[in-house]
């Protein structure tokens, strides 16, 4: 049960890796497929995990992870607890701009099982942006995929002059406005 570390491995040339953690099933898979369909000028590796830690026996085959997106389903308290438990297996250096919280199901606020304050507090405690979306709607799923790809591109160091930490600070400041 190893802790994920952001700089343990060398980056791969012309590629970036994102890890989607949480909210098992269709929406997470559909988001990954939407990301793969988008036009991009670099190779993308998408890994899906229901929770952390990742199995250590395949660690030597796993590429360097550039961005971790924790997926929280707003209608499932288990989803939030799963993400909170998984955070213990992430090295603190990932929280310097290489983590975001993706909250799904916001279109069904009347079926909400998770306190919004708990989600905002999670983002604040871990200095990471919180992104709200509805992955069941195609248009919003595509927009979310594009946004995550741009974040991944920045986190992988593929945008000159913009670091992951700087971008994360910009996102956090704009969320408070």
UniProtKB/Swiss-Prot annotation:
It is found in: Nucleus; Chromosome, Centromere. GO terms for cellular component: chromosome, centromeric region; nucleus. It holds the Pfam family CENP-M. Gene3D superfamilies: P-loop containing nucleotide triphosphate hydrolases. Its main location: nucleus. Transmembrane segments: none annotated. It comes from the Eukaryota. Keywords: Centromere, Chromosome, Nucleus. Component of the CENPA-HI complex, at least composed of CENPH, CENPI, CENPK, CENPL, CENPM, CENPO and CENPP. Component of the CENPA-HI complex, a centromeric complex involved in assembly of kinetochore proteins, mitotic progression and chromosome segregation. This is Centromere protein M.
């Amino acid at each position: 049960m190893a802790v994920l570390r952001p700089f343990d491995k060398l980056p791969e040339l012309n590629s970036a890796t994102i890890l989607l953690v949480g909210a098992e099933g269709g929406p997470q898979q559909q988001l990954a497929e939407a990301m793969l369909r988008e036009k991009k000028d670099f190779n993308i590796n998408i890994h899906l995990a229901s929770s952390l830690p990742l199995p250590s026996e395949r660690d030597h085959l796993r590429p360097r992870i550039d961005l971790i997106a924790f997926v929280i389903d707003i209608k499932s308290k288990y989803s939030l607890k799963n993400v909170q438990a998984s955070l213990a297996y992430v090295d603190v250096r990932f929280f310097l701009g290489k983590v975001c919280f993706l909250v799904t199901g916001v279109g069904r606020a009347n079926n909400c099982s998770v306190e919004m304050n708990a989600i905002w507090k999670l983002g604040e405690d871990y200095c990471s942006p919180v992104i709200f979306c509805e992955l069941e709607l195609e248009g919003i799923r595509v927009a979310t995929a594009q946004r995550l790809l741009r974040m991944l591109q920045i986190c992988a160091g593929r945008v000159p002059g913009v670091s992951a930490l700087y971008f994360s600070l910009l996102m956090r400041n704009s969320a408070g406005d």
